[in-house]
């Protein structure tokens, strides 16, 4: 497939590149005195030059004959050079940044391309939202390669979203220049039980000869995993155990090792390589979801490479996992992923392999970052009005909106969602709760909080009620419109008054995340773009998120990235128990269940 993200297609400049390589024409740029990280052979080649022309690599080796009067010569001074880093699975919306601001944030860290799955904004605004993010990315040097959201809604019939995407929509988007594949196929039950919708969206992608990305979170790695892969799914980022990743790689599926703000799977999953001594060509490092304070403090793929090295993965192997392996996964290694003739001139300068310190970044033959700062301008994009006005709540939310009734009872046993810190799964617990004035009470002493999800897209007035455990909050409430994947309004708390204040605060500011205690807003992150993102700069967003994080701790929650963990409570494609605006969902059986356990 032609990668339209390059400056020029190879067929258009092939003669020039061949001439430059042979010294018949001068190069635009020559890098000298480098230590080349060759990801094709997993070796470092000392004292190597690279000649660049037309935004592509013309020659790797001795390039003295490629230097002309106007050739820009960059002396690497013995630094390593590697192919630009690629993030194979990322939801930009989770950064809370616009695409352009996200690019400004990650490019200086060596990221030259992302495979963006914009299913968050698509759940709110439909394919219009995808187009908005594509347009936002066009003014940046970052290669914004997009996968069409496959599961909008994530699990049909269990929640209300702002839009829906079907096979005919996927067929249309496969004609878009920016689309390189299908976003994560979360509806693995639909694949395994042969639903027309699930196989239809996969089929339209395969017809276009593009990559189908996956989401297989079941621990079963036999018939189910084989059936899932056989349908055409090429990769999966949902491995949380080494044996999961190893099973996928053995079946020819690219196992994506995730290390984001909340999901720290790398420590365990890296053992698939380090303990089994298998070939790593089917292993890819990805971030999935990264918050602004993480980007500001730790970086992006440079940090994930460093983490992989800390877990025992060889440095060159880790770099392969964000370059050639990723490019091959998306069938784009003829364009990206290696410093070899004909490929995009996307080059990262690394001072130290252990610390993965990035000093320069070149994209398409242009120096775009140096010393941790962007050296090129980025155009600002203004999102349309429908993106900035996405809170459509039918009824006024009051403390009474949070009543959970159980007439003629003194106590009752409820199904409670227990979170697993730093993991995407949950447990179903059965816990006895008190009833007062016919209303079921939460129990902060047992770490059991009330949870309500309000539909916010079509003013249906639907709301789902439940209880959650594991946040540690003793007094207060929190709310978010970042609530995967339908992104309805999720409110959690110990009392109805604070819960109502939290909900109404977000309605007034157009969406976001908030923490409340005793009638006071302690921390607020407004996200006016679809209730998911902001047009504020990284530094300002990181400061607001840090303040919100402190507010969470103030009300008693000390888990890592609590807002990310909270955001997954409605995601009905992940085991074990979830809450959507339609009710409580058993995600093993994929059926609604009663909030109360029958006695």
UniProtKB/Swiss-Prot annotation:
MF terms (GO), sorted A to Z: adenine deaminase activity
SUPFAM superfamilies documented for this protein: Composite domain of metallo-dependent hydrolases, Metallo-dependent hydrolases
InterPro entries per the UniProt record, alphabetical: Adenine_deam, Adenine_deam_C, Amidohydro-rel, Metal-dep_hydrolase_composite, Metal_Hydrolase
Domain of life, source organism: Bacteria
Cofactor(s) the protein requires to work: Mn(2+)
Keywords for this protein: Hydrolase, Manganese
Reactions catalysed: adenine + H2O + H(+) = hypoxanthine + NH4(+)
UniProt cross-references to Gene3D superfamilies, sorted A to Z: Metal-dependent hydrolases, Urease, subunit C, domain 1
A single BP term in Gene Ontology: adenine catabolic process
Transmembrane domains' residue ranges: none
EC number of the protein: 3.5.4.2
Family under the similarity heading: Belongs to the metallo-dependent hydrolases superfamily. Adenine deaminase family.
HAMAP family per the UniProt record, alphabetical: Adenine_deamin (MF_01518)
Protein's name in the database: Adenine deaminase
Organism of this sequence: Clostridium botulinum (strain Langeland / NCTC 10281 / Type F)
Gene that specifies this protein: ade
């Amino acid at each position: 497939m032609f990668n339209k993200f390059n400056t020029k297609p190879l067929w258009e400049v092939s003669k020039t590149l061949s001439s430059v390589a042979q010294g018949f024409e001068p190069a635009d740029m020559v890098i000298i005195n480098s230590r080349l990280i060759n990801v094709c052979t997993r070796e470092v080649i000392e004292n190597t030059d690279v000649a660049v022309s037309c935004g592509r690599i013309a020659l790797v080796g001795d390039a003295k004959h490629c230097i002309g009067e106007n050739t820009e010569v960059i002396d690497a001074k013995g630094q390593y050079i590697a192919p630009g880093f690629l993030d194979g699975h990322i939801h930009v919306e989770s950064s809370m940044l616009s695409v352009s601001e996200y690019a400004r944030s990650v490019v200086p860290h060596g990221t030259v391309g992302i495979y963006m799955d914009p299913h968050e904004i698509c759940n709110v605004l439909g394919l219009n939202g995808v187009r908005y993010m594509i347009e936002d990315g066009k003014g940046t040097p970052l290669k914004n390669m997009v996968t069409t959201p496959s599961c909008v809604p994530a699990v049909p019939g269990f929640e209300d979203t702002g839009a829906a995407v079907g096979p005919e929509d996927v067929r249309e988007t496969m004609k878009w220049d920016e689309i390189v594949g299908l976003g994560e196929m979360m509806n693995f039950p639909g694949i395994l039980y042969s639903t027309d919708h699930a196989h239809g969206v996969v089929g339209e992608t395969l017809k276009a000869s593009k990559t189908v990305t996956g989401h297989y979170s079941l621990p079963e790695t036999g018939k189910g995993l084989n059936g899932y892969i056989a349908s055409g799914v090429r990769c999966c980022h949902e491995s949380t155990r080494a044996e999961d990743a190893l099973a996928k790689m053995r079946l020819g599926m690219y196992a994506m090792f995730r290390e984001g703000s909340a999901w720290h799977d790398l420590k365990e999953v890296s053992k698939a390589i380090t303990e089994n001594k298998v070939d790593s060509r089917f292993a890819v490092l990805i971030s999935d979801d990264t918050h602004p304070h993480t980007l500001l403090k730790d970086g992006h793929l440079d940090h994930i490479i460093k983490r992989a090295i800390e877990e025992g993965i060889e440095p060159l192997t880790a770099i392969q996992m964000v370059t050639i392996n990723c490019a091959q996964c998306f069938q784009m290694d003829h364009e990206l992923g290696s410093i070899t003739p004909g490929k995009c001139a996307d080059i990262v300068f690394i001072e130290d392999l252990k610390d993965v310190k990035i000093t320069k970044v070149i994209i398409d033959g242009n120096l775009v970052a140096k010393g941790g700062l962007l050296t090129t301008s980025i155009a600002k994009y203004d999102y349309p009005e429908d993106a900035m006005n996405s809170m459509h709540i039918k009824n006024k939310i009051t403390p009474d909106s949070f009543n959970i009734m159980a007439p003629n009872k003194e106590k009752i046993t409820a199904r409670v969602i227990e979170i697993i810190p730093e993991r995407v799964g949950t447990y179903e617990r059965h816990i006895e709760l008190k009833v007062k004035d016919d209303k079921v009470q939460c129990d902060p002493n047992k770490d059991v909080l009330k949870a309500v999800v309000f539909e916010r897209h079509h003013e249906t007035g639907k709301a789902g009620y439940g209880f959650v455990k594991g946040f540690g909050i003793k007094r207060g409430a929190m709310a978010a419109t970042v609530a995967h994947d339908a992104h309805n309004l999720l409110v959690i708390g110990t009392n109805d008054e604070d819960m109502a204040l939290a909900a109404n605060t977000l309605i007034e500011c157009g969406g976001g995340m908030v923490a409340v205690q005793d009638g006071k807003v302690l921390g607020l992150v407004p996200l006016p773009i679809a209730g998911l993102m902001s047009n504020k700069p990284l530094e300002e967003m990181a400061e607001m998120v840090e303040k919100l994080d402190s507010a969470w701790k103030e009300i008693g929650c000390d888990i890592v990235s609590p807002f990310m963990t909270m955001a997954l409570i409605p995601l009905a494609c992940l085991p074990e128990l979830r809450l959507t605006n339609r009710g409580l969902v058993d995600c093993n059986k994929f059926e609604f269940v009663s909030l109360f356990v029958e006695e």
